A protein has these predicted regions:
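Short secondary-structure boundary/capping segments
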Residues: 64-68, 169-176, 217-230, 322, ...
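Short helix/loop capping segments that flank catalytic or ligand/cofactor-binding pockets
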Residues: 58-61, 164-166, 214-216, 223-229, ...
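A structural signal for the main folded, soluble domain(s) of proteins
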Residues: 80, 87, 146, 163-166, ...
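Active-site neighborhoods of enzymes that stabilize oxyanions during catalysis
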Residues: 17-43, 47-55, 65, 247-465, ...
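A long, amphipathic alpha-helix that forms part
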Residues: 133-134, 154, 161-204, 228-238, ...
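Glycine- and acidic
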Residues: 121-129, 164-175, 212, 444-452
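Metal-dependent active-site segment of extracytoplasmic phospho-/sulfohydrolases and closely related
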Residues: 185-223, 358-361, 365-366
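His/Asp/Glu-rich, glycine-adjacent segments
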Residues: 1-152, 157-169, 307-317, 321-324, ...
Length: 497
C-alpha cells in the first residue's frame, strides 16, 4: 500500500518531500491514483481543489496548475467575476475590510490575554483576507457559472473557517463568524437552484473531512520543537531537515495567483509583473515553509527529515532506502525512541518491529497486530479508532520510520501541534477526528458501507457513497457501477524498497 501518510511526506524513492498542495506534486499524485473513474468523471467540475476527481473541467485546481496542463480551466469562466463591478469590486472592498478586521481581532486577543494563542501578523493578514473573502466570492461565481452551463456535478472547496481557526482558535468568535460567510455562499447557490434558471435541478451535499483540535503548540509548552528535541539526541555532525511550518493554507493563494497570471487582463498583467521574478510553478509560502537543514553539509542529504502535520509528526531516516524497524533505530540511535515516548508532550509513537507496528508510550506499549498491552495503554485516551487507524497508516509504503502523536488532554480537550498553529488537524485527539456529512433527507446511506458502529468510516467509504448517490440520480451511466468496480488502488510513489 502506498497511501499518503500526511499532508506532506518524505518519499524514499524520490529522496525528497512531497507536498500535496505543490502543483508538480499534486499532478504526480493524481497521475498515480487516477483510474479515470473519479467522482467528477461524468461531466463534473472541480473548483478550488487539490485534485480534479477526473473532472473534464477543472477551475483553480492544484493538480492542473503545473505548466502545460489545462486544469486551471477556461479563461471565460473567470471573465464575469474579474470584469463585472458586482464581482471584483465587491470582493476587493470586502477583502480590504477583512484585513482591518483581522488586525483588530488579533490585538483584541492580546489585550484580553486569550490563551492559547499564536502571533497573528505578517503574511497571514493578507492570507485570511484572500481565503475568507476573495476566494469565497470567486468560488461562488464559478459554481453558479457551472450550474448555468448545466454541469452534471460540481465539487468546490471552501477553506474559510479552517484557515481562521488554525490561527485564532477552534471556537473563538472570529472563527465561528466565518460560518456566516459560508451561510451566505450557500444561500447564493440555493437561490439559483430555487429560481429554476439553471438547465437542471441541483441538490447540495456538505462534506467536512475533519474537524480541528485546539491547544498551545508543542514549542510554546516546552520551549523547543520536535525537530530540536530529536536533534539533541543525535550524534554530532548529523543533520536534520525540518518541515514544520504551515503550508496548507497557501494552496488557495497559489491557485489564485496562478490563474490571475494567465489572464489577459489588467489584473493578469499586474500579477505577472509582481511574480515575474519567480518560477511560475514555485508555490508562494511563508518563510521557512520548506524543509530546513539544522546541521551538516548543505549539499548532502539530511540524515533525518522531520515533518509536522498538525499534532502528528513524522520522522524519516532519509539516507536509508527502506523503512527502519524499532530494532534498527535503537541500534543507530540508542535511547531515541525512549526519549520520544517519555516526553510529556508526546502521547505515543508508532514504529515498525519485526512482528508489526507497535505503539510506545511513557508507561506502556500496545502491539497493534496482536492487541497485547504491556503496562498502561498509550492509545487509550485517543478513542476506539486509534488502533485501527494506525494499523492502516502503518502499512503505507512511505510511512515514516517513526510516527509521533502529541499529548491529548481529555479534560481541556487540547492537543499540542508540531506546527505553530493554535488550531490543528492531522493526528488524533479532540475534535479533529469529527468529520461531517450533510445530505438531502430523502437520500439513504448504504448499509453495506457502514462499519460496526453504523458510520461511514474513512475517506474511501465516503467517496463510494457519493459515487453511488450520483449513480442513483442517473449519472455515470458510461462508467462501471461502484458495486462491481474494483477498489481504487492507493497512491503509488517510489519507495526505494
Amino acid at each position: 500500500s502506498g497511501g499518503p501518510p500526511a499532508f506532506r511526506w518524505f518519499v524514499r524513492g524520490l529522496g525528497r518531500l512531497v507536498v500535496a498542495n505543490r502543483p508538480a506534486d499534486a499532478a504526480l499524485i493524481e497521475s498515480r491514483v487516477s483510474d479515470g473513474r473519479g467522482l467528477l468523471a461524468d461531466d463534473g467540475v472541480s473548483i478550488s481543489n487539490l485534485f480534479s476527481g477526473d473532472a473534464p473541467t477543472s477551475l483553480l485546481t492544484m493538480s492542473g496548475l503545473k505548466e502545460g496542463r489545462a486544469g486551471l480551466g477556461p479563461s471565460q469562466s473567470y471573465a464575469a467575476f474579474f470584469t463585472h463591478p458586482a464581482g471584483i469590486l465587491r470582493a476587493v472592498i470586502l477583502t480590504v475590510g477583512e484585513v482591518g478586521k483581522e488586525l483588530f481581532q488579533a490585538r483584541r486577543q492580546v489585550r484580553r490575554r486569550v490563551e492559547p494563542r499564536i502571533h497573528r501578523g505578517g503574511a497571514y493578514v493578507a492570507l485570511r483576507a484572500a481565503t475568507n473573502v476573495f476566494l469565497r466570492d470567486l468560488n461562488v461565481a464559478l459554481v453558479v457559472e457551472a450550474m448555468m452551463r448545466g454541469s452534471t456535478s460540481i465539487y468546490v472547496d471552501f477553506v474559510d473557517y479552517d484557515e481562521i481557526a488554525h490561527h485564532a482558535g477552534v471556537t473563538r468568535a472570529e472563527s465561528l463568524a466565518a460560518f456566516y460567510g459560508l451561510d451566505d455562499a450557500l444561500r447564493s447557490i440555493e437561490q439559483v437552484i430555487e429560481s429554476g434558471v439553471a438547465p437542471r435541478h441541483y441538490e447540495v451535499v456538505l462534506v467536512s473531512d475533519h474537524g480541528q483540535s485546539q491547544g498551545a503548540t508543542f514549542r510554546q509548552r516546552y520551549g523547543h520543537s520536535l525537530e530540536e528535541l530529536i536533534r539533541q539526541h543525535l550524534d554530532d555532525g548529523q543533520s536534520v531537515a525540518a518541515a514544520t511550518n504551515d503550508v496548507e493554507a497557501w494552496g488557495p493563494v497559489n491557485l489564485l495567483l496562478g490563474q490571475l497570471s494567465r489572464q489577459d487582463s489588467v489584473s493578469g498583467r499586474l500579477t505577472k509583473r509582481v511574480i515575474s521574478d519567480r518560477d511560475p510553478e514555485a508555490p508562494v509560502a511563508p518563510r521557512g515553509a520548506d524543509a530546513k537543514r539544522s546541521a551538516g553539509d548543505d549539499d548532502a542529504p539530511a540524515d533525518l527529515t522531520v515533518v509536522g502535520s498538525g499534532n502528528l509528526g513524522g520522522v524519516w531516516f532519509s539516507q536509508h532506502g527502506t523503512r527502519l524497524t524499532a530494532e534498527d533505530i535503537e541500534a543507530l540511535h540508542p535511547g531515541l525512541l525512549g526519549v520520544l515516548a517519555a516526553h510529556p508532550g508526546i502521547g505515543f509513537v508508532v514504529v515498525m518491529t519485526g512482528s508489526g507496528p507497535v505503539a510506545l508510550g511513557a508507561a506502556g506499549t500496545h502491539d497493534l497486530t496482536t492487541g497485547v498491552v504491556v503496562g498502561q495503554d498509550p492509545l487509550a485516551p485517543f478513542g476506539p479508532d486509534a488502533v485501527g487507524d494506525f494499523v492502516h497508516v502503518s502499512t503505507f509504503a512511505n510511512a515514516p520510520d517513526i510516527y509521533v502523536n502529541s499529548l491529548y488532554d481529555p479534560v481541556l480537550d487540547e492537543v499540542a501541534a508540531f506546527e505553530e498553529l493554535v488550531g490543528c488537524h492531522g493526528g488524533l485527539g479532540g475534535w479533529q477526528t469529527r468529520p461531517l456529512l450533510v445530505h438531502p433527507a430523502g437520500w439513504s446511506v448504504d448499509a453495506d458501507l457502514l462499519d460496526e458502529r453504523g458510520r461511514l468510516h474513512g475517506a474511501d467509504t465516503v467517496h463510494r457513497q457519493l459515487v453511488r448517490w450520483l449513480e442513483r440520480l442517473g449519472h455515470r451511466q458510461d462508467l462501471t457501477p461502484d458495486a462491481v468496480a474494483p477498489v481504487p488502488l492507493p497512491v503509488s510513489l517510489p519507495t526505494g524498497e
